[in-house]
Amino acid sequence: MKLAYWMYEGTALSGIARVAGSMPKVHTVIHGPQGDGYINVMFSMLERFHKLPPFTLSPIGRREMARGSRARLVETVRRVDALHQPDVIVITPTCSSTLLQEDLLAVANSLGRQTKARLIVPQVNAFRDLEHFAMDDFLAQMVAAFAVEQPKTERFTVNLIGPSYLGFHQIHDLNEIRTMLEEIGIGVNAVIPYGATVETLRSLTRAHLNICLYREYGRETCEYLRKRFGIDYISITPMGIRQTGRFLRALGEQAGIDVTPYIRRHLAPSGALARFTKSVDALSSLFGKRAVVFGDFSHAVGATYLLREIGLQVVWAGTYMTAWKDEFTEAVAALTDEAFVCDDFQAVSRKIRDTQPDIVFGTQMERHSAARYELPCIVISSPAHILNFPLFPAPVLGYRGMTRLLDTINQTIKLGLEEHLVNMFGEDTASERQMEAASAAARGTATAPTGAAGAVATVDELQWDAEAEKALKQVPFFVRGKVQRNTENYARERGYSEVTLDVIYAAKAYFEGKGNQGNR
């Protein structure tokens, strides 16, 4: 158990809710305090449920803490069975029920004869297990409870294991993967947990192959199906040119299909990907830019591949999945200078501050950190804000997901419509007003005389002369703050009291030289 006021991963309850809440006719009874009802809010807000999410709280209050909560739980389960008539009722433990040492399995065994629904208690540790570990274990538990041997489909089909509610663009990814499979001639037998019923779980064994789309969870389910029913699986997240190619070739090998024409068609010189990555525009705006990446395992590795493929330099790549430190380090070793594994968001924020990259790729927390340091940021992984649960199709996997990401990267790094409007109508930002105030103060106070190289500084506050101010205003607004900081740091280190045009050019040459050395 860890005391924190912000975490990258949710609790075991969050993981169980993501699996159970993604499955129709499965209702979850949460045996915990009133605060654990937050699950309903998450589903209603982020996934925009048009009906009440399938969760019912069996509240633990002061009375239950004193007398025991078994009677309240039994009453809640009976009410859910009669009112909602689900196929499965999941009785999930929480930290509070664990503290009370409630035997939920005994409750389920005794109640199972009285309910129409099948009762299942997730075998997780509410204190120790985090979101993705609980998802992995519970999904495998559900599959083991219902999967039975069935004859294979005549056509080569696969099971897609991974897509769920509250995942990062996962429903959009599911639609993209479905389309990709249909285009190469492979059918989809089942998808779990999203949209999966008890009958879906029973029919999993009809597929010829399982696909684990995300490293975070689903692998245990694939291992169970391989050992119990002999169904092989592949575990590749198709994000980026190389990873998507690996994914397709592995599929083609299993299905006996030649996928080379499909890959060539999407990577052809006339295709959107090739036109973008080889254009003068992309080379001038993207090539050599310094980026940092942080997120869950799958998206951090995939984004690192993609960025290297389009010419960005990944200074470091990181993940908050500390249990897979060695595996992650090996996965990105050839792609970046440093692998950074940490689940402390403040340490990640400090590392971004010290690196000062041109662009940040991360979670919602890295978006906040980047905004604090005036750096552009793209969210590529959960945890994410509601902005990253769009209604319009927005995959990140496959070739179409790649083109969408490239658009986002290009728009974030380069000047867009906003800058054109600024050029047309002018800009009156807080930083500009502060500079004007500093300039006015400088004109009212005496400063040390400056020569061609500048004078020795007597105060920490640097002044900018009129020509330097004019030059700074011509710098694109989204990097203006960084240029100002770098120039002032350069001036202070060399003892200048005033920033002149000569100082700006000298600082520019200095930092460009450092960048070129880093690229070599």
Swiss-Prot record:
Cofactor note: Binds 1 [4Fe-4S] cluster per heterodimer. The cluster is bound at the heterodimer interface by residues from both subunits.
Quaternary structure annotation from Swiss-Prot or TrEMBL: Protochlorophyllide reductase is composed of three subunits; BchL, BchN and BchB. Forms a heterotetramer of two BchB and two BchN subunits.
Keyword Protein transport in annotation: no
Record function comment: Component of the dark-operative protochlorophyllide reductase (DPOR) that uses Mg-ATP and reduced ferredoxin to reduce ring D of protochlorophyllide (Pchlide) to form chlorophyllide a (Chlide). This reaction is light-independent. The NB-protein (BchN-BchB) is the catalytic component of the complex.
InterPro entries, alphabetized: ChlB/BchB/BchZ (IPR050152), LI-POR_suB-like_C (IPR013580), Nase/OxRdtase_comp1 (IPR000510), P-CP_red_C (IPR042298), Protochl_reductB (IPR005969), Protochlorophyllide_Rdtase (IPR016209)
UniProt cofactor(s): [4Fe-4S] cluster
Main enzyme class: oxidoreductase
Pathway stated in the Swiss-Prot or TrEMBL entry: Porphyrin-containing compound metabolism; bacteriochlorophyll biosynthesis (light-independent)
Family membership noted in the UniProt record: Belongs to the ChlB/BchB/BchZ family.
Residues engaged in binding substrate: 416-417
Catalytic activity, EC: 1.3.7.7
Name of the protein in question: Light-independent protochlorophyllide reductase subunit B
Residues where [4Fe-4S] cluster binds: 36
Keyword Kinase: no
Residues the record marks as active site: 281
One Pfam family linked to the record: PCP_red
